[in-house]
């Protein structure tokens, strides 16, 4: 577990910072005010970007899972598929148990004079707000990729020059993957599909379930079936 934390320290650290920042904001700022503060900076370019980028969570995880199953170790594909499915099921369970109103519904009932900045072409939802399923998918997906990539980049000798370069590349990739996940999470607030609390919970579920799945599967990494490849290198 220490090796896992060391190899993924950048992504884990940044995720914890994001969770802490959102948690403090939720404690200090009223729900409606926080949402308006976070979704108020609309421009035509941002509208287009977030409208389409948020859809990545709806199809890209399937592409990644299939690609890993076909072209990487079969164990990596099973790990990724398990993390994404379990995190999605956990989110859906809480969504239907809580059935919280989405921003459009909540503002209509509690702050009817406020006109939310909506984006043309985005189909709005009204219920099942907590947690954010897209946020869960974004963080589970990019954390899974982070774990797999850093596992390949992890140096055998942490003292040589090659190891230092590998650590630098790994750190930059982890930061990039975190940014991609965070942009996806923020798109849900920007589009007024979710509140900050929904995104907060989505990050926790996505990261938490992925860690649980890694702990479950890492013990099998030395097994022959885990390292089996459908398409072996010649």
What feature does the model see in each segment?
Residues 54-70, 134-139, 149:
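Hydrophobic alpha-helical transmembrane segments
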């Amino acid at each position: 577990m220490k090796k896992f934390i060391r190899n993924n320290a950048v992504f884990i650290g940044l995720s914890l910072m994001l969770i802490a920042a959102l948690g403090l904001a939720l404690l200090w700022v009223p729900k409606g005010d926080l949402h308006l503060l976070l979704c108020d900076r609309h421009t035509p370019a941002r509208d287009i970007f977030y409208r389409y980028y948020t859809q990545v969570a709806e199809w890209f995880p399937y592409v990644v899972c299939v690609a890993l199953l076909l072209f990487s170790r079969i164990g990596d594909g099973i790990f990724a598929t398990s993390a994404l499915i379990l995190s999605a099921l956990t989110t859906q369970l809480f969504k239907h148990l809580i059935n919280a109103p989405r921003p459009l519904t909540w503002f209509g009932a509690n702050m009817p004079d406020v006109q939310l900045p909506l984006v043309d072409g985005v189909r709005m939802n009204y219920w099942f707000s907590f947690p954010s399923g897209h946020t869960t998918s974004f963080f589970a997906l990019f954390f899974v990729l982070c774990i797999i990539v850093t596992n390949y980049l992890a140096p055998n000798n942490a003292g040589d020059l090659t190891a230092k370069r590998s650590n630098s590349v790994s750190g930059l990739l982890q930061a990039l993957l975190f940014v991609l996940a965070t942009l996806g999470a923020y798109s849900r607030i920007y589009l007024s599909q979710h509140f900050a609390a929904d995104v907060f919970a989505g990050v926790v579920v996505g990261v938490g379930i992925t860690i649980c799945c890694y702990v479950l599967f890492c013990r099998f990494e030395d097994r022959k079936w885990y390292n089996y490849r459908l398409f072996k290198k010649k």
